[in-house]
Amino acid sequence: MATIHVDGKEYDVNGADNLLQACLSLGLDIPYFCWHPALGSVGACRQCAVKQYQNADDTRGRLVMSCMTPATDGTFISIDDSEAKAFRESVVEWLMTNHPHDCPVCEEGGNCHLQDMTVMTGHSFRRYRFTKRTHQNQDLGPFISHEMNRCIACYRCVRYYKDYADGTDLGVYGAHDNVYFGRTESGTLESEFSGNLVEVCPTGVFTDKTHSERYNRKWDMQFAPSICQQCSVGCNTSPGERYGELRRIENRYNGSVNHYFMCDRGRFGYGYVNLKDRPRQPQQLRGSDWIHLNADQVMQGAADILRQAKKTIGIGSPRASLESNFALRELVGAENFYTGIAAGEQQRLQLMLKVLREGGIYTPALREIESYDAVLILGEDLTQTGARIALSVRQAVKGKAREMAAAQKVADWQIAAIMNIGQHAKHPLFITNVDNTRMDDIAAWNYRAPVDDQARLGFAIAHALDESAPAVADLDRSLKGKVDIIVQALAGAKKPLIITGSSAGSDAIIEAAANVAKALKNRGSDVGITFVASAANSIGLSMIGGGSLDQALELLTRGEADSAIVMENDLYRHAAKDKVDAALDNVANLIVVDHQRTAIMDKANLILSAASFAESDGTLVNQEGRAQRFFQVYDPTYYDDPKKPESRSIMLESWRWLHSLHSTYTSRHVDWTQLDHVIAACVEALPQLQGIVEAAPDATFRIRGQRLARSPHRYSGRTAMRADISVHEPRQPQDIDTPFSFSMEGNNSPLADRQQIPFAWAPGWNSPQAWNKFQAEVGGSLRFGDPGVRLIEAGEGTLDYFDSIPAAFTATAGNWQIAPYYHLFGSEEMSQRSDVIQQRMPTPYVMVNPADAAALGVNLGTLVEFNCAGQTLRLPVRLSDTLAPGQVGLPLGLPGIPPILVGARVEDLREAVQ
C-alpha cells in the first residue's frame, strides 16, 4: 500500500497502480481517453493531467499525466488545481476541432465517454470555426458500423484489436492530425472479438450495427443481469429491451469471469429471441389443424394426455436452466428423466465432472487463466468452441513480456515499455487439433492429427512427466522430441494449464488431459485444468443426472413408453435422424416445450410456448462449475392488445409450464409460485446443487426498502409507448420472482450493496466506463463481490491414472472417419438462427485431404455425397493439406450437420450425381 495526498486529503492506495487508476478506485473523477483498465497506459491523449507537488510545502507543482505516474508513497497531487483543470479543458477543445457536433444523431449519444469527459472538464463552447477534416467510412461487416469522422485518435481501438486480441486487419494509417483507424479496404473484421470495439471506443466511431436497425438510447431501454446462452463459458451480459424486442447486448462486468470483453457470438447472436415464427401461444393438434389454447385449456389437455398415457418420459436439455430441467424431472419422476444429451457426450461430461471432483486439480476461473505461464490445449479449436477462454489464453501467452518487464521493475501498467521489452516473447502454448486453429499464430507448436493420435500424445506427455503414468508403447518416433520439448516447458512452468473438452468426441483425450495434470501435480506444480463443454448448461444438467437421450429413444422405440415431454431440445441435433424418427413414430402423444420452432414440433401433439432467456429467470452452471443466475429482461405480455386476444403472448418459463402441468395432473395447488420455491425444492432433492441458493439474492432482497431498477431513471415515453394499442396505461408488470422492478423505480446506485447490476450508470458516467464506479478497485472485482458461486472445488486427488490408451489411427481405403470442425458463427444451435450470424456462417462443406480427393477423383468445389447416421449429406469439397488422410472434416452444428456425427465412420463417400 501507498499513502497519497489528493487536494489536501490523505488516501491509502495500491502502490502498484498509476495515479489515474488509484484515484478512480477511490471514487475521484479524473477525465481520460486513451487509458483502459485492461489495456494499460500509453499517455497518448494528455487528458488525465493533474498537478503534482514535490512535497507538502511545494505550492507551484508541475503538470503530469496521471496515467503515466506511479502512485508512490508520499505523492502529493491536485485534481482541482486551476491550471490542471484549464489544461484538461483545452485538451477536449483540441479534440473537438475535428469532431462533428452530431450528438443528436450519433448512436453513441447517452452512452458516450466523450460526452461524459467533455461535461466533466467543463468545455461547453466551441471556438473553432474552420473546416474539419473528413474521412470515408468503411463497411466493416454485419456487426459494426464505422463513422471515422467522430474519431479523437485515442488509439484505444488498435491497442485493443491488435495488441490485446491479436487481430491483424485493423490498423492506423496517416500522420499528425490526419490519422485513419480502419482496414486497408472495406471488409468484414476478421477477429472473433471485434464487437468489443463498440465499448472500447470512447466515441461513436465503432457502433453496434445490429442495434442500429432498431435503435434506442441507452436511457430508454430496460436491462437485466443475464448470462450468455451461446456456449459453456458463462459470460455476464446486459441485454437491453424496448417495445418487447431485444435491442442489443452489452458486456456486463464480472471480475472473475469475462471482465471487460466477450465474443461476437455472445454479443450479436441474440436475434433468435426476436424471431416472428416463435411459438407465442400454446397449440394443440386436432386432426390436421393446430388450435391455439389459453393456459388453462392447455394444462387440462396436457394433464389428460398424462392420465391416459401408459408411461411418460421427460427429455431435458443442456440449453435449459437448472430449474426447468428439475421441474421436468419432478413431473415425470427421476427414473423417467433423460437429459436429452447423446450417450457419448453424456459420458464425456460425467468424466469431466469426475476429474473436477476427484482429480484434486484446481479449475481456474476465466480471469485466472490469464495468470498461467504454460498452456497445453488438447483437441479443442478453442476460438470456435470456447472463444472467451481463447482470449484469456492469448493474455496468458503475453504474460511472458510482463514477466520480463517485472524483472526490470517496470510497472504492470506501463504497456508500451512492456511490449518493447518483450519483443513478442511468449509463454509456451501447445495445441493439438485435427486441423489448423485460429490460435496457431501464438502457438509454440501445433500437432495436427486424428483425435486418437492427439490423445496418445497426451498420454505420452503424462508418462514423460511421471513414469508411474501409463506409457504409450509404439509412439511415433518423430513425436518423441516434441514430447520432450513440451514436458520441459510444462515442468519448468510455475503455473501450467491443461485445456480440453468434449467437442473432439473422445473420452481418451479427456483422460489424457487429466493424466497430464495429475503428473504435473505429482511434481509439485501449481497446475490447473479447464474443460470446455458444448452448451450453456451442460455441466449443470450433468450434475442433475439422468438417462441419456439414446436410452430414451430406445425406450420409446421398444414401446415401453408411449408419451414424451421434450423440453427445449431439438432431438435431431443430439441423435441420428433415423433413430429419432423411429422412436417418435411409436409415441402416441408428444408434448414439446420450447421458445423456438424446431423440427421436433412437426411431430408434436401439444406445444407449450416457453420463454427465452430474455423473458425468464434461471440458473446455469458454466464449464468452471460456477452457478450463475440470469434474470428476466422484460414481460412480453405488457405489449399485448387486450382487444386482440388471438395475438396475446402466453409464454411462460419452462419450469412454470411443467409445474403447472404437474399440479393439474395431480389435482393439487401450485406449490412453486416463484423462482425461489423451485430453487429450494431443487437443492433439497439434489444436495450437490446446494450452492445455487447463493448464486443471487432471493425475491425479498431490497436496498433501503427499494427494489432494484431495471431501467435508468431517465427512461422516457412509458405513458406513450403503448398509445397505439390503448390510451389507458396499464400497470407495470410485477416481478414476484426477483428483487428487480420492471421500471425505472428502484435503486440503481453504484454504492448499493449488490452484485447483480442490470446496467452500468453513475452520476457523470453514462458510458460503459461507468463500471469503474462499481468496482472495489478499477479493473478488479466488483465492490461487493463478483456474482456467481462455484459448486465444484478440487477434492483430495483420489483419482488414479487413466490407462485406456487408444490405438494409433490408421487410414483405410474406402473408409473415412469424420473429423470435427466447429465455427463460432454457425455451430451453436440458437445463434445460427440470427440473421447477422447467418451472414458470417460458412457454406456447409466436407474437408478432404488432397491425396484422398485425388483417389476419389474430386476437386475443390466438387459436390460429394455420403450416408451417415441415417441421413444423406451432399456437400462441396474443400481441401486441406493438414487434415490427415483417412478423415473427412464436417462443420458440425451447422444446420443439417448434427454434432453427434463426430467420430462416425463413412464408407460410401462418392461424387454426387449432377
UniProtKB/Swiss-Prot annotation:
[4Fe-4S] cluster 2 binds at C151, C154, C157, C201. [4Fe-4S] cluster 1 binds at H99, C103, C106, C112. One of its GO terms (cellular component) is membrane. [4Fe-4S] cluster 3 binds at C228, C231, C235, C263. Pfam families: Fer2_4 (PF13510), Fer4_Nqo3 (PF22117), Molybdop_Fe4S4 (PF04879), Molybdopterin (PF00384), Molydop_binding (PF01568), NADH-G_4Fe-4S_3 (PF10588). Residues 1-83 form the 2Fe-2S ferredoxin-type domain. Residues 221-277 form the 4Fe-4S Mo/W bis-MGD-type domain. GO terms for biological process: ATP synthesis coupled electron transport; respiratory electron transport chain. GO terms for molecular function: 2 iron, 2 sulfur cluster binding; 4 iron, 4 sulfur cluster binding; metal ion binding; molybdopterin cofactor binding; NADH dehydrogenase (ubiquinone) activity; quinone binding. [2Fe-2S] cluster binds at C34, C45, C48, C67. Its EC number is 7.1.1.-. SUPFAM superfamilies: 2Fe-2S ferredoxin-like (SSF54292), 4Fe-4S ferredoxins (SSF54862), ADC-like (SSF50692), Formate dehydrogenase/DMSO reductase, domains 1-3 (SSF53706). It comes from the Bacteria. Keywords: 2Fe-2S, 4Fe-4S, Iron, Iron-sulfur, Metal-binding, NAD, Quinone, Translocase, Ubiquinone. Composed of 13 different subunits. Subunits NuoCD, E, F, and G constitute the peripheral sector of the complex. NDH-1 shuttles electrons from NADH, via FMN and iron-sulfur (Fe-S) centers, to quinones in the respiratory chain. The immediate electron acceptor for the enzyme in this species is believed to be ubiquinone. Couples the redox reaction to proton translocation (for every two electrons transferred, four hydrogen ions are translocated across the cytoplasmic membrane), and thus conserves the redox energy in a proton gradient. This is NADH-quinone oxidoreductase subunit G. The gene is nuoG.
